[in-house]
């Protein structure tokens, strides 16, 4: 099965929600809680004519609404618009932010991933309550940022309110657009 426009995916682990700990503790029982939806998908098929690097079997980090269920106007639980059938979903190329190909995570333009810097590291800006504001380390750049001279591991400054947190391989990362990177420090 192939789509002319969409990636055909299934949720990693066959789970729509990632709302339990390794010990079985339920973190959230609400279907409306976007913070516990599964954010990872396995590629079943790429779009017809797709010429990129992603192949079936690769893992995508997807938008929180891809696998989410909702309650309609009548109170009936329904899948969101990405659902195709059973555990199969169709996603557009703007609904994934990172992909794992040959064991390596990569970011497609216009997205990149920045690791926040905690206050234990040296920095000019210090906030005793959390991570350094508006500063991080470029964890996964993209071809556009690389063409501008940035590389993974560079310390960067980014625009306020541009960070959107994900947990990738146990590490907190901010997904943001390439245009949100302001300065290489």
Regions found by a protein language model. Name each.
Residues 1-185:
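Acidic-enriched and Gly/Ser
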């Amino acid at each position: 099965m192939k789509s002319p426009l969409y990636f055909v995916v299934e949720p990693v682990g066959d789970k729509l929600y990632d709302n339990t700990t390794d010990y079985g503790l339920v973190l959230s029982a609400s279907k409306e809680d976007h913070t516990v939806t599964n954010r990872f998908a396995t590629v079943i098929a790429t779009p017809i004519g797709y010429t990129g690097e992603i192949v079936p079997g690769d893992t995508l980090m997807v938008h929180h609404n891809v696998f989410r269920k909702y309650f309609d106007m009548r109170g009936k639980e329904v899948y969101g618009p990405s659902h195709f059938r059973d555990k199969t979903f169709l996603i557009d190329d703007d609904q994934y932010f990172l992909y794992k190909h040959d064991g390596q995570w990569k970011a497609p333009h216009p997205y990149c991933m920045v690791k926040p810097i905690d206050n234990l590291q040296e920095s000019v800006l210090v906030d005793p309550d959390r991570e350094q504001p508006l500063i991080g380390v470029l964890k996964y750049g993209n071809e556009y940022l690389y063409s501008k001279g940035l590389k993974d591991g560079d310390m960067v400054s980014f625009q306020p309110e541009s960070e959107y947190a994900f947990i990738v391989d146990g590490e907190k990362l901010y997904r943001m657009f390439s245009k949100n990177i302001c300065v290489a420090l």
